[in-house]
Amino acid sequence: MGKFTSFLKRAGNATKRALTSDSAKKMYKLAGKTLQRVVESEVGSAAIDGVMQGAIQSIIQGENLGDSIKQAVILNVAGTLESAPDPLSPGEQLLYNKVSEIEKMEKEDRVIETHNAKIEEKFGKDLLAIRKIVKGEVDAEKLEGNEIKYVEKALSGLLEIGKDQSERITKLYRALQTEEDLRTRDETRMINEYREKFDALKEAIEIEQQATHDEAIQEMLDLSAEVIETASEEVPIFGAGAANVIATTRAIQGGLKLKEIVDKLTGIDLSHLKVADIHPHIIEKAMLRDTVTDKDLAMAIKSKVDVIDEMNVETQHVIDAVLPIVKQEYEKHDNKYHVRIPGALKIHSEHTPKIHIYTTPWDSDSVFMCRAIAPHHQQRSFFIGFDLEIEYVHFEDTSVEGHILHGGAITVEGRGFRQAYTEFMNAAWGMPTTPELHKRKLQRSMGTHPIYMGSMDYAISYEQLVSNAMRLVYDSELQMHCLRGPLKFQRRTLMNALLYGVKIA
């Protein structure tokens, strides 16, 4: 358990001349053209916000517009295609989640329809039957009395698909670590196929880094979406195909509705079982100007294997420790679904393995806190708080609350969220640089519980999340990159740095 505090480092202040200069007017005009093209490109709000942020940074800090847009686009689009919304805007989070859900469902349905026969051959008919039940394509009578059987099939299916993905990517990882002369023909073929995808991704990112005018941004965004779709499956399940029907592990799991049927019949939320399509460490390697060696690429791929294995251990934990409790609840109701069962097994939303966001009742724009909770089997969490008014950050490992999904007793180590929040507020209040008005608002906030603003999923391992948080505490160059522009953009950039990490190019 650890506790760390630090002052954030911010770049220089704005100059009034920049706002009225001829160069600023040109930037406004160019930003307008750029935004029009980006809006028409169907890439989404992440790209729009990225261009907006780039233009604002240029005007405020006197930077070259191309450089600013370059940084913002790499962070928001090339890095993830799932840029985080403003942590203190529940409405923005809701809209973002709804749009993401619609896009995800459309892609999943397309994958299942295209690869239906191959999925049945590889994973069996039972998983496709679960999809039909959730979508209401079979009679409800077929489910009645067989609920536990379908829950078991869904969980074992999740584990089977996850292990299959882990085995495929681990083979690639081991092949990359093997000396070139000692590789088998299959290993050489596997590496060559992945190298083609990686090189295409690298070229797309190089175009983004060179984008200094609006046409390049349009072309680059379209290319990124296409390349990321192809590169997201390092070793294909069923072989390569057209970009719009590539069968990714994530799309197959989602399309089969395995998590949905578990949630529907038991109340157990498994939405945290997520793996990034392309791990941020692979994106980081693709941003390097130099040739990426096999050993470096292997270590980046190992990061994705770590996330997949963490999700598989979590699924196994649910099967071993939680499923027996589910069966006990069903036995109370003659082994049939009852409306009380989900309520008995549900846990508080603030205890789920996500990043939970809070703010203070007063001076809310400047102060926000994140509580990151690890997968249930790890029983860990941490607190990180930011006071942007005085440029202060506080990190602390915290204990977790006991609940039914831990499957038994928990070990309480360290202080809880409330104690960490109180210390963060006290420390910020006691800083000599804290303005008097801000002090008064902090003092008022100390006597109340922080306001809960929602949660965000993370698609990296918990250890990688902790590492990203520690970089925000200690890396002054990263802090200067994050603390630019209006507070809204600073908060979004900090969340992106926490969720995915940032490569300063």
UniProtKB/Swiss-Prot annotation:
Transmembrane segments: none annotated. Pfam families: Orbi_VP5 (PF00901). InterPro entries: Capsid_VP5_Orbivir. Belongs to the orbivirus VP5 family. Coiled coil: none annotated. The keyword NAD does not apply. This is Outer capsid protein VP5. Residues 1-42 are annotated as: Involved in membrane permeabilization. The keyword Cell wall biogenesis/degradation does not apply. One of its GO terms (molecular function) is structural molecule activity. Its main location: virion. GO terms for biological process: symbiont entry into host cell via permeabilization of host membrane. It is found in: Virion. Keywords: Capsid protein, Outer capsid protein, Viral penetration into host cytoplasm, Viral penetration via permeabilization of host membrane, Virion, Virus entry into host cell. GO terms for cellular component: viral outer capsid. It comes from African horse sickness virus (AHSV). VP5 protein is one of the two proteins (with VP2) which constitute the virus particle outer capsid. Acts as a membrane permeabilization protein that mediates release of viral particles from endosomal compartments into the cytoplasm. Permeabilization activity is probably negatively regulated by VP2 and is triggered by endosomal degradation of VP2 and exposure to low pH.
